């Protein structure tokens, strides 16, 4: 049986912490920022944990 390939899109979008949690970037911070408030863009800066419902699928794509 051949090895599973890592999903290229997933490896660019998600990172695994030392404790095994999966982090992701927040959406809506790429362009059209002039009409978004500073408060909103500041809040979107940080990474966030992946929701519990998506963890199993993302781990499979990353080959974890």
From Swiss-Prot:
One of its GO terms (cellular component) is cytosolic large ribosomal subunit. Gene3D superfamilies: 4.10.410.60. GO terms for molecular function: structural constituent of ribosome. SUPFAM superfamilies: L35p-like. It holds the Pfam family Ribosomal_L35p. PROSITE patterns: RIBOSOMAL_L35. It comes from the Bacteria. GO terms for biological process: translation. The keyword Ribosomal protein applies. Keywords: Ribonucleoprotein, Ribosomal protein. Belongs to the bacterial ribosomal protein bL35 family. This is Large ribosomal subunit protein bL35. The lineage of its organism: Bacteria, Bacillati, Actinomycetota, Actinomycetes, Micrococcales.
């Amino acid at each position: 049986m051949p090895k599973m390939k890592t999903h290229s899109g997933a490896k660019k979008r998600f990172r695994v912490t030392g404790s095994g949690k999966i982090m992701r970037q927040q959406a809506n911070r790429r362009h059209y920022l002039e009409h978004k408030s500073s408060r909103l863009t500041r809040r979107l800066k940080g990474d966030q944990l992946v929701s519990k419902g998506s963890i199993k699928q993302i781990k499979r794509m990353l080959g974890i």
